[in-house]
């Protein structure tokens, strides 16, 4: 494993496949958020010699970029713990009003105030995204073809979505179903190792015959969409009669 300081608040950890195997992990574990992956990230942080700037950090954000033979993990520390002063929360409702709130209403009110007082935390996340974009925009020498490729398709209704899944006659590693802005989005992960170089383009052309290609990213769906089926969405929907 290797650690690279991207900025004061962002580092990149490169994890090789053999490192994953030693920790009982595999690429598929990172396709959907789960407690197992979060525990793995913090285990890695304990094992590595972290920069001093991260030793006193509070909240951390993780973003994963799969590569053919490794995993790049971008870690950004939150600045909210350094800049949030509870005296700044004086504009919370008074005690009488708080006493009338349900626990959920109180937590939402507190969360809103903390969010408004912690703009630096947003800056930290944006810095992570910028660092990732700059890092992945520079191709490595002798870089091999990616083993996995993601397709994201958009559907206006469930009927068209289900009809599409019944046309899928090629291997799919995993798939997810999201709903956002009254549209359905299907993410499909395909293993293209050992396939001809034109195989990804052929797949996309076949998909476009029954579905709408989109520039919407999986990160956007994860942040703003509703995850309806966590894994094997294609296989589950193929069983539905319409």
From Swiss-Prot:
It comes from the Bacteria. Gene3D superfamilies: 3.30.70.1950. It holds the Pfam family MecA. One of its GO terms (molecular function) is protein-macromolecule adaptor activity. Enables the recognition and targeting of unfolded and aggregated proteins to the ClpC protease or to other proteins involved in proteolysis. The N-terminal domain probably binds unfolded/aggregated proteins; the C-terminal domain interacts with ClpC. Homodimer. Belongs to the MecA family. This is Adapter protein MecA.
């Amino acid at each position: 494993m290797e650690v690279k300081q991207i900025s004061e608040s962002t580092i990149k950890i490169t994890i090789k496949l053999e490192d994953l195997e030693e920790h009982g992990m595999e690429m598929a574990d990172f396709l959907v958020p789960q407690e197992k992956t979060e525990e793995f990230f913090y285990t890695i942080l304990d094992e590595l010699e972290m920069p001093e700037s991260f030793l006193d950090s509070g909240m951390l954000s993780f973003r994963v970029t799969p590569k053919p033979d490794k995993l790049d993990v971008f870690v950004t520390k939150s600045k909210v713990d350094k800049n949030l002063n509870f005296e700044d929360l004086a504009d919370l409702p008074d005690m009488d009003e708080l006493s009338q709130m349900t626990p959920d209403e109180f937590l939402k009110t507190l969360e809103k105030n903390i969010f408004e007082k912690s703009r630096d935390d947003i800056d930290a996340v944006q810095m992570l995204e910028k660092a990732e974009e700059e890092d992945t925009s520079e191709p490595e020498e002798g870089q091999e073809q990616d083993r996995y490729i993601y397709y994201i398709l958009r559907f206006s209704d469930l009927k068209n979505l289900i009809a599409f899944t019944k046309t899928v006659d090629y291997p799919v590693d995993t798939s997810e179903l999201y709903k956002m802005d009254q549209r359905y989005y299907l993410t499909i992960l395909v293993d293209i190792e050992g396939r001809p170089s034109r195989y990804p383009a052929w797949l996309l052309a076949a998909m476009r015959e029954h579905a709408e290609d989109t520039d919407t990213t999986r990160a956007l769906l994860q942040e703003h969409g509703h995850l309806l089926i966590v894994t094997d969405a294609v296989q589950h929907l193929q069983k539905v009669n319409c």
